[in-house]
Amino acid sequence: MKKIILIAFSFGILSVNAQQIKLEPGKKITSTSTADMDMDMGMGGQMKIKSSSVNVLSITGSDDKNYKGTNTITKMTMSQEGMGQSTEYDSDKKGDRDSETGKALGKELDKPVQILIDRTTGKATESNPEKTTEPEADTNPMAGVMGGMSEKTAAAMVSSAFFIIPQGKKAGDKWSDSTTEAGIKGVRNYELQSISKEEATILLKIVSKGVISKEIQGMQMEMNMNTTAQSIIRTNVTTGLVKKNSTTGTVEGTLDMMGQSMPISMKMSSEVVFE
C-alpha cells in the first residue's frame, strides 16, 4: 500500500509541475547537436553530410506569460562529401569563416536573437523576427536545396529545449497532435514510456508530407517530401527542460527543377544534449 501511495504521489507532482516550465533569470542552457545525413539524388548523385552546432540560450527576464531571452549559435562544423567534391567547415577556424562556405553557413553565427518562451507550452517565438536572405543560393544551387530541406529558425531551436507533458498523463499513455507549416503537414504521435519523480522518457513518432517551393538562380524548384521520424526524448518533469533528444528518420520524395524530376532518398540521425 505504501508503494502505491508513493507512485500516486509521483504522478501528482507530474500533473502539477507539467503545467508550466520553470526558469530563472540569468540561467543559461547550452545545447550541443550532432547530425548525420546520407542522401541519394539518383544518377550517382550521392552525398554524405555531418554537422554539429552549439547554441546558448540565456534567460534575461520574464512576465506573467513568457520568459524573455536570447539564443546564440556559438559554434558550427560541417563536412560534406559527394558528387566528386568534399567540403570541410569549422567556425573556430578563421580561414574557414572567410571561405565561401563559411560566409554562407556563418551568417547567423554569434548573432543573438531575441526570444519569448511561453511559460505554459514552452513554445518559443522571435521577439523581433528579421527577414533573412539566402545569398549562397544565388551562387550555389545545392546550398539552396539543402537550405530548403533543413531550415530551422532560432525559435524552433529554443522550442526543442522544452517538453511539457499533458496534465494527468501516466506511463503507457498515448496522445497526438498535428501541424501545418510552410507547406508541410505533419502528425505527431506521443507515448509516455516511463516516468519517475524527476525524469520522463517520451517516444515521439512523426509522419509528414508536403511541398517546399524555392527560387534558385531565377529558377523555380519544388521538393515533394514524405518524412517519417522517431525520437526518444528525456525530459525533467519538474522544470520542463529536455535533457536529451535522439532522432532517426527517412525522407522519400522528388526534386522538380528545369522541367526535370529527380528522386530523392535520405536517411538521417541526430542527437541534441541540453545542459
Predicted stretch roles:
Residues 19-275:
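Signature of exported/secreted
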Residues 1-23:
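Bacterial Sec-dependent N-terminal signal peptides
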